[in-house]
């Protein structure tokens, strides 16, 4: 038996109208991984996800990058328990490679909410004798577990050149991020720097065994994310008003928690 053409045609019309009337559903907008790095609150790689204070700090293009005014730095790991994010700047000098210096610059917001951790030490190398950190600001340099400049110049292939060229040991300085933040390398008058993480237990360990990079220590904004995640939602924010929003499903966002919209 054949359906009369008119019935088929009206079915098609009804179907078309129904399909057009359906709201356009978007899939969950927050990716929870970038490669093998989990992305959780307060971070987000899709706009509207995570805490608004951390908006546009990460991008995920094959690898995860931390974006600052001085460039994108590859994220090595995020420790959500210790609230740290470790980045590595491939343009930075380390014990094994000497590269032209390149300031690490963060925005004011970044410096405020995720400054380098206390166990990240910056080593300013090959400083001129006129450097402020050897004169007026010499108290910014500290005793780094008894390590010396000569240890770096002598123990690292990359830094041996400082020793060779000057036939002596040019000064160096172990300091915290604030020194680098407030004075650019040009003002500091040191030709290179490197930074070392996890510095709490480096007494007696030579520079070949240090871990180079920058560890940022972030704080969680107090936006009521717990309530949202306990209700099964994902914390995000309204991209226009920047107000916190609880993302409940692909078709429903609540202001505070899923199940209630008040
Ligand atoms: C929910 O919020 C996200 C992030 O701001 C947004 O991308 C999405 O379009 C919103 N969905 C609805 C249904 O409003
Ligand atoms: C992400 O950051 C990296 C490093 O700065 C850059 O090369 C890449 O183009 C950025 N990707 C997007 C999608 O912005
Ligand atoms: C060390 O610093 C001096 C300036 O104080 C500079 O002329 C020299 O090129 C630097 N050495 C290297 C290997 O960059
Ligand atoms: C630096 O600290 C070490 C202990 O970590 C100590 O043995 C050494 O004497 C100190 N050096 C100076 C110059 O204060």
Model region roles, listed by residue range:
Residues 2-262:
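Extracellular/lumenal glycoprotein segments
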């Amino acid at each position: 038996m054949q359906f009369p053409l008119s019935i088929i045609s009206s079915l098609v019309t009804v179907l078309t109208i129904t399909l057009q009337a359906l709201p356009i559903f978007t899939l969950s907008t927050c990716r929870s991984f970038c490669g093998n790095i989990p992305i959780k609150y307060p971070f987000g790689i899709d706009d509207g996800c995570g805490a608004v204070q951390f908006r546009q700090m990460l991008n995920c293009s094959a690898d995860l990058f931390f974006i600052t005014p001085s460039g994108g730095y590859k994220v090595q790991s995020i420790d959500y328990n210790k609230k740290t994010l470790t980045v590595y700047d491939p343009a930075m000098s380390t014990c094994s490679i000497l590269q032209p210096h390149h300031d690490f610059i963060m925005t004011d917001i970044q410096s405020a909410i995720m400054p380098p951790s206390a166990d990240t030490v910056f080593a300013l190398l090959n400083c001129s004798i006129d450097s402020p950190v050897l004169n007026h600001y010499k108290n910014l340099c500290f005793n780094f577990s008894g390590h010396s400049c000569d240890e770096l110049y002598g123990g690292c292939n990359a830094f041996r050149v400082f020793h060779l060229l000057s036939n002596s040991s040019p000064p160096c300085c172990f300091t915290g991020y604030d020194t680098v933040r407030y004075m650019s390398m040009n003002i500091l008058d040191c030709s290179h720097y490197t930074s070392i993480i996890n510095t709490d237990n480096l007494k007696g360990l030579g520079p070949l065994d240090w871990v180079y990079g920058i560890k940022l220590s972030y704080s969680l904004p107090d936006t009521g994310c717990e309530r949202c995640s306990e209700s099964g939602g994902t914390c995000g924010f309204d991209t226009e008003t920047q107000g916190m929003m609880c993302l409940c499903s692909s078709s429903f966002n609540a202001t505070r928690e899923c199940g209630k919209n008040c």
